[in-house]
């Protein structure tokens, strides 16, 4: 399976196999960092054949832009008949971007095995949630695309695990 973290999801990258030393070298733009010193952020990934990769895409900064990227990645899983799922993290601000909506719609229509985790930070940069959307909950936006949505308290690790596992299992089933 493949995931695409946000810049705040360093823990997810570590779970997928990135090492603290690797991350520090990346931040310092060292020649032996994952991007060979060409980038001094955590915008690096490791994706390729399922057996040869740690399975995480490098992040890109614009809000919501990884959703259509992951929709395309997961479409390729379907086209090749691979039993793989893609998971993408976005912040609440990303749900107000065109790229987010295009990616969600594309994934839904093509039945891509994609799971989107929306982290509600309460603010997108300096914009409060109340100025972004009139939806009572971000999962309400899923209804418009005909896809299921679940909610969990992000501070409850077990609840997040349970919701994520259900979503991944559902995506894998098609």
Question: What is the meaning of each model-derived region?
Answer:
Residues 118-174:
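Thiamine diphosphate
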Residues 111, 116-119:
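Short internal beta-strands
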């Amino acid at each position: 399976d493949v995931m695409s973290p946000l810049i705040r999801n360093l823990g997810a990258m570590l779970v997928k196999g990135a090492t603290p030393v690797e991350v520090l070298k990346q931040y310092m733009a060292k020649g032996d960092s994952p991007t060979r010193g060409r980038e001094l952020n955590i915008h690096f990934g490791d994706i390729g054949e399922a057996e040869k990769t740690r399975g995480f895409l490098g992040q890109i900064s614009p809000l919501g832009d990884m959703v259509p990227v992951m929709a395309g990645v997961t479409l390729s899983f379907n086209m090749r008949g691979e039993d793989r799922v893609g998971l993408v993290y976005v912040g609440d601000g990303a749900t107000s971007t065109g790229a987010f909506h295009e990616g969600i719609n594309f994934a839904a229509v093509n039945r891509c095995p994609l799971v989107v985790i929306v982290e509600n930070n309460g603010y997108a940069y300096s914009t409060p949630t109340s100025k972004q959307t009139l939806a009572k909950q971000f999962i309400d936006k899923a209804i418009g695309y005909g896809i299921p949505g679940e909610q969990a308290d992000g501070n409850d690790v077990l609840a997040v695990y349970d919701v994520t596992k259900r979503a991944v299992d559902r995506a894998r089933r098609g």
